[in-house]
Amino acid sequence: LGISPKETMSIAQKLYENGHITYMRTDSLMLSDDALEDIKKKVNKEFGEDYYQETKYKSKDKNSQEAHEACRPCKFSKHTLDGLENISYRENRLYKLIWTRTMMSQMKPAKVEITSIKIGFKDEDDKVSKNNFVSKKEFIVFDGFLKASSVYKKSKETKEEEQVEEEEPEIEQVEKDGKKILEKLKKDMDCSYVKIQASQKYSRHSQARFTEASLVKKLDELGIGRPSTYSSMVSTVQDRNYVEKKSIEGKEVKLENIKLENDEIVEKEDKTKIGGDKNKLFPTPIGEIVNKFLIDNFSEII
């Protein structure tokens, strides 16, 4: 959603106070029997009985405090709060996300068909090379829980969302065209190239800097804090100037692209920027000093 943890909890608090969602400061995965029954009715009515699958979740975290239900909508009949007074754009977006994820939790998994295509070639001695061009294509056979996202996208809220919805038919057409191409392919058939293009790419660093959201996820994985404290923890390290949220521009690098077409090799040079970060958390000099002090003196608990 592009919303900070602090603002997310503030928005969730308003939704809770207005009776739209249940208590949000919980790490429980449990849903009440009444809620499960209401979800079942909604899924069967909205998507059909083929999409419903009852699932009862249990937290794997031994320290989980399941005193409340999982955060969920109070009324499953409302997938959006559009039209209600005093409901902001962001409040509606968060509510719709909670509604969608809750519905998905009681729906069948999606089924995907994966087709792999390998194109080999012969070397100068007319021997088949061990190297292959490999391509994989996924087709959704049964959309399952993904069907709930179609309801999430029903209302057009921004020009950006309108553009996405306008592009969907084109995406569906690409899927259909892709299937038609695959149907024409046969095992061991000969094929000739029309164009072969190789483009230079730079891989991203495996350990990216934290965003506020990814930091919360990491805290949860490490068992540090609780849902009620994540927001304040992320805010505190920024308020104390241990870290700062900022964006940095990447450096410009050259890319070499090679194209083989009509038995002619064409080399082209492009430029791109790498190493940039947007809205990431960076340690400050104070943060680095505090971190070193903690490691030197409290290494056994860090």
Regions picked out by a protein language model, each given a short descriptive name:
Residues 1-302:
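Core catalytic DNA strand-manipulation module of type IA topoisomerases
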